[in-house]
Amino acid sequence: MLDVKLLRTQFQEVKEKLLQRGDDLANIDRFEQLDKERRRLIAQVEELKSKRNEVSQQIAVLKREKKDAESLIAEMREVGDRIKQMDEQIRQLEEELDSLLLSIPNVPHESVPVGQSEEDNVEVRRWGEPRSFSFEPKPHWDIADQLGLLDFERAAKVAGSRFVFYKGLGARLERALINFMLDIHLDEFGYQEVLPPYLVNRASMIGTGQLPKFAEDAFHLDNEDYFLIPTAEVPVTNLHRDEILTADDLPLYYAAYSACFRAEAGSAGRDTRGLIRQHQFNKVELVKFVKPEDSYDELEKLTHQAETILQRLGLPYRVVALCTGDLGFSAAKTYDIEVWLPSYGTYREISSCSNFEAFQARRANIRFRREPKAKPEYVHTLNGSGLAIGRTVAAILENYQQEDGSVVIPGALRPYMGNRDVIR
């Protein structure tokens, strides 16, 4: 959520920044209109209350002097009724303003490249060289089917499309990757592990920015008003909702494995085969709470930490800075890490690392004090995938496939796979 003071004092600058996103400006224009009306009404109410206080004193004097005060009393009843009506108008305006604030996206950081779509994203760096095959590389779903690692057909029978059964060494590979990623983030980068709830309440979804904008992409339990989490970002960020932390608490680093659930409402016809786009998938998520002045250094660290996983696995990737038109609703700046998938002949997103500045903290009321009696300030929050597990499985199967249909297990992963070096 944006700072109301920023909207009032730098309205045109904010509007221009949001225009760079390609955002519909109707909400911010409506906000300005309603905010002016609210402040006008508040000024009128204060004026009426001041008048009421003055006249009340006059009435008191008239009563002490045994003089007739009925006309003034009647006038003040009318003033009281007007104040009551205007207070109700103000309350309704404030409700609408609060709703509008929740629907206005974050302002892009000045370093974010300006553009309209993913075509305008800017490549920052590459690591590793895509492998040259002496045979036609197969897509990961064909490799997995031949090795008995994944079963999409039976998952469709049991649940529907965009679900999968991991079987045998496929299930072990998934579990190995979860443990491998967590061990690196905990032991080398100092994250604290949390295992979050998979169901969250509405306030949590609002806090991280999933609601109200992305309601159609969420799985909602109507009878309890719970939501299945689309990412561990939601419960872990809300871990400190409505709290005031101390300066000594920061930075806070959390690493969380969870299943993630997404309706993929806008993805009809896209990535219909394989592990790239599922309704349910596993992910290791990294979440940071930091002081505002540290957040952009922390974004660089976060991105490098996610990259480390791909480097240890020997998977070629690139890092791109998202342009303003491709930036997520809550993010001020985002780097996507894209892994090379031979069957696609291109790089595909495997991690998204974002700095939200105070946008989520303001929605979730997460603050800190620099000194014991100092005024609370909003923390900055960051998160990133460290990594998406299913897409990592896909990348390993495709990049390490052999002509005979087997798959070599990356060296760093072998201790987690019973010291196997190949899947046959």
Curated annotation (Swiss-Prot):
GO biological process: selenocysteine biosynthetic process; seryl-tRNA aminoacylation
EC numbers on record: 6.1.1.11
UniProt-listed SUPFAM superfamilies: Class II aaRS and biotin synthetases, tRNA-binding arm
GO MF annotations, alphabetized: ATP binding; catalytic activity, acting on a protein; serine-tRNA ligase activity; transferase activity
Predominant location: cytoplasm
Catalytic activity of the protein: tRNA(Ser) + L-serine + ATP = L-seryl-tRNA(Ser) + AMP + diphosphate + H(+); tRNA(Sec) + L-serine + ATP = L-seryl-tRNA(Sec) + AMP + diphosphate + H(+)
GO cellular component: cytoplasm
Entry keywords, A to Z: Aminoacyl-tRNA synthetase, ATP-binding, Cytoplasm, Ligase, Nucleotide-binding, Protein biosynthesis
Gene3D superfamilies found in the cross-reference section: Bira Bifunctional Protein, Domain 2, Serine-tRNA synthetase, tRNA binding domain
Keyword flag Ribosomal protein: no
Pfam families, A to Z: Seryl_tRNA_N, tRNA-synt_2b
Sequence similarity: Belongs to the class-II aminoacyl-tRNA synthetase family. Type-1 seryl-tRNA synthetase subfamily.
Subunit structure: Homodimer. The tRNA molecule binds across the dimer.
Protein name: Serine--tRNA ligase
Annotated organism of origin: Geobacillus thermodenitrificans (strain NG80-2)
Phylogenetic placement of the source organism: Bacteria, Bacillati, Bacillota, Bacilli, Bacillales
Gene name as annotated: serS
